[in-house]
């Protein structure tokens, strides 16, 4: 099925190139409804790196350092199974030993 945002249930657009800095770019995007950030791990073997990249983008939105961010207070996250070639997902990942790619999503909580 087409991937949907776990935070607002909106359909997600296919990933595009997102420039992180002058030396690094990734495949990802943002949810058109709630603004959640997503980055693709095509192999499912680099999720730690993808998490740090997405949290870096989230920290920039909050003008904070990544090390100062608190899950539940500053952001919430989810990991979806994902096939970038077909732009399909079976939903929230239930394990990491299935050989599928991943879509790591971070929803930045708005400060009041």
For the regions a protein language model found, what residue spans apply to each?
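Short linker/helix segments within small regulatory modules
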Residues: 18-30
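Short acidic alpha-helical/loop segments enriched in Asp/Glu that coordinate divalent cations
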Residues: 14-20, 43-46
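Long, contiguous alpha-helical scaffold regions
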Residues: 60-112
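Cys/His-rich microdomains that often coordinate metals
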Residues: 9-13, 38-39
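Short metal-binding segments enriched for Cys and/or His
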Residues: 30-52, 60-69
């Amino acid at each position: 099925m087409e991937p949907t945002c776990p935070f607002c249930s909106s359909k997600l657009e296919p990933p595009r190139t997102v420039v992180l800095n002058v030396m690094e770019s990734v495949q990802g995007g943002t949810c058109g409804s709630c603004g959640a950030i997503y980055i693709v791990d095509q192999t499912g073997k680099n999720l730690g790196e993808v998490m740090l990249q997405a949290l870096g983008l989230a920290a920039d939105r909050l003008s904070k350092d990544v090390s100062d961010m608190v899950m539940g207070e500053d952001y919430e996250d989810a990991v979806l199974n994902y096939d970038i070639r077909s732009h399909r997902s079976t939903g929230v990942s239930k394990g990491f030993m299935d050989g599928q790619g991943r879509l790591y999503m971070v929803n930045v909580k708005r400060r009041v």
